Amino acid sequence: MEIFTHLLLLSVLYMECLVGFTVNMIFLAAIFMKWKTQRSLPTCDKILSQLAISRGLYFFSVIMGNLIFHFFPWLLQNYIVLSIQYIQAMFMILISHWIAAILCVYYCVRIVTYNCALWVFLRSRISTLVPWLVAASVIVSLLSSLPLGWFGYDCKSQNISNYSAGSITGNGFVIVPNMDIWFLILILGSFPPFVIFCAANSLLIYFLLVHTKRMRNVTSQNLTSHFGALKSMSLFLVLQIMFYIFTSLSASGKFLRIKFVIPIYWIILCFFPLFHSFYLFFSSSDLRKILISKCLSFINCT
């Protein structure tokens, strides 16, 4: 019964990751088709493409990590493979936080209007700053993840071999993750982008709420667009907060000895980016129209 439950949870996790990877690759393909048609992309779509890439790689890394852990555990006896696995797992989480923060800052700067000189300067420069911000986020995420390659695990005797997150080496030791280091690196690496994201998103939601109240007597089309933006950013804020909470809980290692906790944690952690990826794709009518038209033209040609 335990084996059946474990396999069922793994099947749900792999299916969830495959769907998430596919949705983000379709989203990325739609953006590419838009660029191919128009020969240019607005900055917002460029950031969304980076978000789709980071989430696609996140789902792919979850699949590969769980495949290695459950079906090829002997690979984790190699310290190089283990270090690479730990580094890329942390990198995917941190870069997702940073890209989400950059997207929210861009929306906030472009939509919120203030007469402050710094704000006016940011509005005029934000499009040119975005590529540098993305590059900096990649570097910061990588540098923040590298310590896991050296300090992210401990070697202990086989008397704790029942530890669900460990792997036994050929020397009779069990390699277990050092959850104190995991938690410390995750908090130090993800807290700055999370604070930036929450601050920018909260400011944007407040501005949209105030602006929507002032537009009660304006045309319904403008009011509908503001309601849509308000709903989208509120959903993004809730999902990102939940993602941050559950990644922090998983990195704390408090529940690793509970049966089936690892696949359950990954199922929960993958749900938030999966749900938001679906929402982004189906709420973007332009990208859906471009993708549908390209698919129809391809079908007609064949």
Task: Annotate the PLM regions.
Residues 99, 125-158:
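Fourth transmembrane helix
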Residues 144-150, 169-200:
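Extracellular-loop-to-transmembrane junctions of the mid-late helices
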